[in-house]
Swiss-Prot record:
Gene: upp
Regulation: Allosterically activated by GTP.
Keyword Glycosyltransferase recorded: yes
Pathway: Pyrimidine metabolism; UMP biosynthesis via salvage pathway; UMP from uracil: step 1/1
Name under which the protein is recorded: Uracil phosphoribosyltransferase
SUPFAM superfamilies, alphabetized: PRTase-like
Role: Catalyzes the conversion of uracil and 5-phospho-alpha-D-ribose 1-diphosphate (PRPP) to UMP and diphosphate.
Lineage of the species this protein comes from: Bacteria, Thermotogati, Thermotogota, Thermotogae, Thermotogales
Length: 209
């Protein structure tokens, strides 16, 4: 798992534990997902380049640094990825936002695309793909396929929890993509859910079950 970075931080561990609790309600669950995404983004954006700018303080002029976040694209996988987008956009408010709709067929576990709306993607854009649960990896692999078909070349995948199977699937198909997660869990069960995981993130966010 050469491309995997598990962001080891006490705040992330604390907040993720609350999210795992089956008794945590949707309001708190949403807030925690947004907060953890913000913390993950701190590390996932570490490679971004800064340009020097001159700034005038109340005392004197000095050299500062600026990220051109207009060259950044945030792409959540619907629907649970939407909340993650809110977190990263607090740090990068001028980033463009695309959306990819993919669901995993419960019988075949294959990824099915039902929606894609993306801003212009060229090789210079820094793209952050957001997928809360990297389980089998089929949804993330499909989304990465779509992004690259549309011209993206610099892509970082940010997930809340990953299973080893999902990480391996992404690395096999997209070895150039770095993966940042809050936790690497044990395995998948027979239904393709992460163990111990936190259940279906989308259902818990939107109370659809």
């Amino acid at each position: 798992m050469k491309n995997l970075v598990v962001v080891d931080h006490p705040l992330i561990k604390h907040k993720l534990t609350i999210m795992r609790d089956k008794n945590t309600g949707p309001k708190e669950f949403r807030e925690l997902l947004k907060e953890i995404t913000l913390l993950l983004a701190y590390e996932a954006t570490r490679h971004l380049k800064c340009e020097e700018v001159e700034v005038e303080t109340p005392i004197t002029k000095t050299t500062g640094y600026r990220i051109n976040d207009k060259d950044i694209v945030v792409v959540p996988i619907l629907r649970a990825g939407l909340v993650m987008a809110d977190g990263i956009l607090e740090l990068l408010p001028n980033a463009s936002v695309g959306h990819i709709g993919i669901y995993r067929d419960p019988e075949t576990l294959r990824a099915v695309e039902y929606y894609a709306k993306l801003p212009p993607l060229d090789g210079d854009k820094e793209v952050f793909l957001l997928d809360p649960m990297l389980a089998t990896g089929v949804s993330s692999v499909k989304a990465l396929d779509i992004l690259k078909e549309n011209g993206a070349r610099k892509i970082t995948l940010v997930a809340l929890i990953a299973a080893p199977e999902g990480v391996e699937a992404v690395e096999e198909k997209h070895s150039d993509v770095k993966i940042y997660v809050a936790a690497l869990d044990e395995r998948l069960n027979d239904h393709g859910y992460i163990i111990p995981g936190l259940g279906d993130a989308g259902d818990r966010l939107f109370r659809t079950k």
